[in-house]
Amino acid sequence: MSGKFLSKAILFSLVIGANAFSGVSAANVYELAPVVVTATKTAESLEKVPASVSVVTAKDIEDHNYSSTAQALGATSTGIYLSPVADGGISMRGFGSADILVMVDGQPVNNGWNGSVDWGMIPVQNIERIEVVRGAASSLYGGRAVGGVIQITTKENKEDGLHGDVLLSTGSNSTTKQVYDAKIKKDKWDVNVGYEKRKTDGWRGYFIEERPGYNDISDPTVDADVGTSARDRYIVGGRGRKAIDSESYHVKTTYHFNEDKKLTYSYFHTNYNYAYNDPFSFIKDKDGKEIFYGHVNLPNGKYFDIYPGDFLGYVGQKEWAVHNLAYDDDKNQFHARIGLTDIKKDGYSSTGGPEESISAGDLQKWNGDGSQSFYPSKTKDFDMHKTWELGQHTLLAGMAYRSESFDQTRYKLTNWRNHDGPKSAYELHGGKDESWSGYLQDKWQANNRLAVYAGVRFDRYKKYDGYGSYLDSGVSRTYAEGTYTEWSPKFSLEYALRNDTTLFASYGHSFTPPILSSVYRDEGAKIQNVNGQLTVAKKGSLANPDLKPETSDTFEIGVKKKWGDKTFASVSLYKAETKDAIEYYSTKKATIMNGVLYKNGFSQYRNLGDASKKGVEVEAKHKFNDKWSTYVNYAWESEDIDGEHNYNLPKHLVHFGVEYNYNKWDILADAQYVSARQTPDVERGKYQSEDSFFITNMAFNYNVTPEAKLQFTI
């Protein structure tokens, strides 16, 4: 999406708390106090851990009034790119969401459908901290951690008694947010319950493009002159505003057996709905009335047809339920957890629309037939590990289990906007996988300066029970299972110099199973029997049950430096080499696959070759005095796939900001620059051109009382 289509958002918030976090005078966002992280599954100082780590705190989230977890990550963390066109599209060191393990209180929340994370499902105001570990972590966390780990920790009670927080926020595009939290700590019990509701009418976007050459409509016919996109297609209008309505609630209950042992059950549930409203057309008749159906002649002699369905977007629905039960024994350094991520609803509906002239108002209300793709999924997992202190050695051993499944159904709807109305299924797809793992890590503190980490993980991965059925044509398939095993070693060194400087180097091997939708999902294309040959007339997307796991080797070196208590800086260089890289293959050549003739070709995920990623990351923080502090981070990244450069990655990512904190005021200003993500020959400054963009943010916080705060953010 071109930067010129990025929107400005203004929010005004009121935060009220009964002894709430929001009213407590806290240290500056960029203060350099030591931070403990869990990059090695053991407590380590941020400056000492042999990895590149960023931390986002509850105060960061509160002061910036971030509307989503993805926004908090993309705005502050080094090397993370947040897509401006999707709430959930992030990449880290060139790896996408499916290759970044995301956990909430230790529970993985990557979905079983395509491995991505719907960030809108995670209530952002309930987050205590986010730890971002960049680089391969598969030796401890498994295959989804080839790009890194994002660990989200939710809030716990810190004081006895009953406490509560209220946040009310309103902004542009009818954006509102309500957050209500209540916490109670009494004797051995901690209980935290909360509710969050977000709603927005959205903004005009997602423009409609047409290719020239279609001439099936004879009436009406109109002459028009419209602009072109970066793909040399004609922009004729748009779907309108993408309205979002999400509602979530959460419960976290902890029983403390004593100071060292506790049992915690947490649950959060989210409903997320979206729809496009108020479609618009740039094609108009002589009276200036919008046209959504007709034949369009251009001044250059080219032409195309437009249909009302082109201007109608999607109606989407998601429902998540995440359960997590954890036992922690800090004294004996034993931890165990079992969890379920149950995505009860996931999918969307669409329509071809009416094939007749229609007004904008009637098109918005049109509720004729359509289709729905519905793909709920489940992820079950278990992890337990124990740590032993053996002289100069800290030994950690653990085991883990993870299973995923999805079942996709495609329906014909009588009312394309109503998912609960009359419908009939015409396609079924699904499959499962599971992984058993054991892992071991040893930290050898050779002396007070040198620490050596060595670890290994064994994975046994199986994909099975894959199926596909086309109910209209009677074609059904079952797929053979596949089993793979892999050893994933990791080795790291950390050396402390005398002048508050730490050097580190690491190597990690990763084993990444393919996501289930790439293995077992076909993209609906009608199968017909033509003279005894099963045939698909249009191009289809096929399942690939033979898809193999990727393997990667990641190398990293870095240095971290402190100057007193006011300045910290770090530099790291990395390179990741991937074998059997999974890429999207497409051909227009007529091909027979699985006994079906695809006349116009097909698309499919395949192990196509090797990929190489490399990059540099720089981070610096400085506290001038008690009032002023600043930060800057920069990432350069590049990827080649079989020798060809991947232009979809931004080469340069820059974040910088400054904070002023005095008396009752806390003022923040920060900015982000993302370089272009397109080939050099693409025309810039047009829709669909991935131009560079620059985002600035301002946040004004005023503590009215110790329990109430006013916020204004841009």
Annotate the PLM regions:
Residues 170-200, 210-277, 317-328:
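Transmembrane beta-barrel wall of Gram-negative outer-membrane proteins
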Residues 326, 333-349, 392, 407, ...:
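Membrane-embedded beta-barrel scaffold of Gram-negative outer-membrane proteins
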Residues 254-271, 310-470, 478, 494-496, ...:
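Face-selective signature of the C-terminal outer-membrane beta-barrel domain
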Residues 70-108, 128:
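Extracytoplasmic beta-strand/coil segments of soluble accessory domains associated
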Residues 445-452, 570-578, 587-589, 594-682, ...:
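Gram-negative outer-membrane beta-barrel transporters
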